[in-house]
Regions:
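Amphipathic alpha-helical "lid/sensor" segments that cap RecA-like P-loop NTPase cores
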Residues: 4-49
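Accessory nucleic acid-recognition modules appended to NTPase machines
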Residues: 33-203
Length: 204
């Protein structure tokens, strides 16, 4: 598997729009990028089944497995967006408290992460809500039922999933280098926005 990864890195990847969305659609889970699994649908279906049956069940004694799968899908539809717990809960038909618990499970098991808003005492008009991201965009594309990169690039979430991909890659690059990454986003009430703000050594 390592040799396949090295060969892939040496070949390089396309950097045009088609190539980027191919990477987004494929995702970055080891089983996919190593070439061990050749059928993407089978891989992600198996991954989700194993994740819910094993990992989630280890964290909570009882859970509505089908409801939880629907919940992950509803969250995936909102990747790269401001977190709205009530909207996700409404889509799935669960309470806001249940939605908060299930988001906690997804965060604890490294399926999702949040970008907190950047703020200081001089910035009074900033939005306070975090933004929701998935670590793997291939999972997002699978959950939202995009059957190819070509369809995804013209889909309703094309901008949001591209942002998700960029933010996740930045975060993973810091993690892989063993570095802390203080990442934020900035948005004020006039809708002025910076997608990523990185704080290091007291500077932005």
């Amino acid at each position: 598997e390592l040799s396949k990864l090295q060969e892939r890195a040496q070949r390089g990847m396309q950097t045009d729009v088609t190539g980027i969305y191919q990477r987004i659609w494929n995702g970055a889970m080891p089983g996919m990028i190593s070439g061990k699994y050749t059928n993407r649908e089978t891989f992600y279906s198996s991954y989700l089944q194993s994740y819910i049956e094993r990992d989630v069940s280890d964290m909570v004694e009882r859970i509505d497995k089908l409801g939880f799968l629907d919940f992950i899908r509803a969250a995936a539809c909102r990747c790269g967006q401001l977190l709205n717990i009530h909207d996700i809960a409404s889509d799935v038909g669960c309470s806001a408290d249940t939605a908060k618990r299930w988001l906690g499970i997804l965060e604890k098991s490294d399926v999702i992460f949040y970008l907190r808003p950047y703020s200081n005492n001089l910035l009074k008009r900033t939005i306070k809500t975090p933004k929701l991201y998935f670590f793997d965009t291939g999972l997002v594309a699978y959950l939202t039922k995009y059957s190819s990169p070509e369809i995804l690039v013209n889909g309703a979430i094309n901008g949001a999933i591209l942002e998700n991909y960029a933010v996740a890659e930045i975060r993973k690059s810091y993690t892989n280098a063993g570095m802390d990454c203080l990442m934020h986003y900035y948005r004020d009430r006039d809708s002025k926005e910076v997608d990523v703000v990185i704080e290091a050594d007291g500077e932005l």
